[in-house]
């Protein structure tokens, strides 16, 4: 089993890359794929760049060329809700694209046209594994729930409240 780990920025993977026992580094699509061992697991870690398209390209390369069984996206995000603070961890149970807008066709905001689902569910086993790992740490709080993702940096309170309303979200990705 090979695990793919992606982050948008180098700072998000810096600590993991330092702990990795590197075997190879390959460049594909202007991204560096670091293959090796991390805490006894076979891993390919990649800084994919900012944006959902970069993340999608990276994920496809991980699946097609490295045969990863799962992909974990790590990185910074903005908390939604009064109890989430910098340094806390949010584990996604499902994800919604907040910038997908086909409301003109009668779809709810975030709905991908012609799909029977509003959100993308995360692998339950990976979610439980992440929760168990975080439960062992005491220097941060852990939350789980919906993460909303979009290709914009959100800083206004109005937009944050809107994201909380449409997505019933715990966290917003900063892509």
Report each predicted region and the residues it spans.
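Short, conserved "active-site rim" segments that organize catalytic pockets and cofactor/ligand binding
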Residues: 1-20
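Active-site regions of enzymes building and remodeling cell-envelope glycoconjugates
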Residues: 23
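Glycine-rich phosphate- or other oxyanion-binding loops that anchor nucleotides, phosphorylated ligands
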Residues: 2, 26-174
């Amino acid at each position: 089993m090979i695990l793919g780990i992606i982050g948008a920025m180098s700072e998000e993977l810096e600590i993991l890359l330092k702990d990795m026992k590197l075997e190879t580094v390959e460049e594909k699509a202007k991204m560096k794929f670091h293959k090796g061992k991390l805490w006894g697991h076979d891993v390919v870690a990649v800084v994919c760049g900012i944006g959902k398209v970069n993340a999608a390209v990276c994920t496809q390369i991980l699946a097609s060329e490295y045969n990863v069984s799962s992909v974990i996206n790590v990185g910074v995000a903005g908390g939604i809700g009064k109890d989430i603070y910098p340094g806390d961890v949010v584990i996604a149970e499902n994800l919604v694209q907040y910038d997908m807008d086909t409301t003109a066709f009668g779809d709810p905001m975030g709905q991908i046209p012609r799909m029977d689902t509003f959100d993308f569910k995360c692998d339950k086993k990976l979610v439980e594994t992440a929760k168990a790992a975080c439960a062992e740490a005491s220097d941060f709080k852990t939350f789980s729930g919906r993460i909303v993702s979009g290709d914009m940096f959100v800083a206004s309170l109005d937009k944050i409240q809107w994201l909380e309303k449409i997505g019933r979200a715990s966290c917003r990705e900063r892509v």
